[in-house]
């Protein structure tokens, strides 16, 4: 990791989400009044309650938009996209859904923990999913998965109903990020490759037909091992952690934004989004440009 970015003392998750949304609206040339739903995927919310999405809806003037937050840890953006697709497919009144992945983990780090302080960073990325009549493009397949037996292996455990804020919680630093046990290194590679194969099989395509892969950016070796296991060239996978650090729910839309701006993605090409995070939560989706 050559560089990473943290919120200032006066910045918070809603600030990151707001700017990402403004960028997405400008790029898509869509008015705030045309957004029907705002979904914010984050495990570092503005508050426990109300939702971060409600704060941003007011700031952006999304006068016609419903809002809610989603917390599936670092798999959040893929989960939020899947929810957005389902809303669009199920209800004709949802035509433009603004989806954001955001991360302000610097607020929860222990300064003396060198394993986390050097890795985690802050950021946000947004995309707009739109209802279209053309059925051969856009969303194709998705799959969600949870391995709940790992729920107590890593996370932020203080400050909610199980361990409310009190003297003991603060003394134990339970309100900050903790890695209780080490996640098996091969687990991501195994589950990522299995889920990707499954959604490609559903679509009746080969994994090698997919031109672009956007993974959770937690470990470049996990990405490379997965690409090797799939028999796909490594260069098809976006890697941005060296430039931005690990940005949780934000890393996949940030990587997508970088590839879109560099004109790497062509019409008719397949994209896979593969997210994973604490819980353990996993989400995979297949789109066609």
What are these regions (language model features)?
Residues 14, 18-21, 25, 44-45, ...:
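Claisen-condensing/thiolase-fold acyl-transfer catalytic domains that form or cleave C-C bonds
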Residues 1-10, 113-186, 194, 289:
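Condensing-enzyme catalytic core mediating Claisen C-C bond formation in acyl metabolism
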Residues 81-150, 256-289:
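Conserved beta-strand-centric core segments of catalytic alpha/beta enzyme folds
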């Amino acid at each position: 990791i050559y560089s990473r970015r943290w919120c200032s003392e006066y910045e918070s998750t809603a600030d990151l989400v707001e700017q990402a949304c403004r960028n997405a609206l400008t790029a898509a040339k869509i008015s705030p009044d045309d957004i029907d739903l705002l979904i914010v995927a984050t495990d570092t919310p503005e508050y426990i309650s109300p939702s971060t999405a409600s704060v941003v809806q007011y700031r952006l003037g999304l006068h016609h938009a419903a809002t809610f937050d989603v917390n599936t840890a670092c798999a959040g953006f893929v989960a939020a996209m899947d929810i957005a697709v389902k809303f669009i497919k199920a209800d004709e009144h949802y035509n433009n859904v603004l989806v954001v992945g955001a991360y302000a983990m610097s607020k929860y780090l222990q300064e003396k923990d060198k394993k986390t302080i050097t890795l985690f960073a802050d950021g946000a990325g947004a995309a707009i999913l739109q209802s279209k009549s053309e059925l051969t493009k856009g969303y194709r397949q998705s799959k969600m998965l949870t391995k709940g037996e790992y729920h107590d292996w890593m996370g932020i455990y203080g400050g909610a109903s199980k361990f409310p804020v009190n003297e003991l919680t603060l003394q134990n630093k339970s309100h900050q990020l903790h890695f209780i046990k080490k996640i098996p290194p091969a687990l991501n590679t195994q589950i990522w490759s299995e889920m990707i194969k499954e959604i490609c099989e559903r679509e009746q395509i080969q994994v090698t037909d997919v031109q672009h892969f956007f993974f959770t950016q937690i470990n470049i070796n996990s990405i490379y091992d997965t690409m090797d296991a799939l028999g796909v060239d490594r260069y098809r996978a976006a890697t941005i952690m060296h430039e931005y650090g690990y940005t949780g729910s934000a890393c996949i839309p940030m990587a997508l934004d970088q590839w879109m701006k560099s004109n790497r993605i062509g019409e008719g090409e397949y994209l896979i989004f593969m997210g994973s995070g604490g819980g353990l939560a996993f989400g995979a989706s297949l789109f066609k440009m």
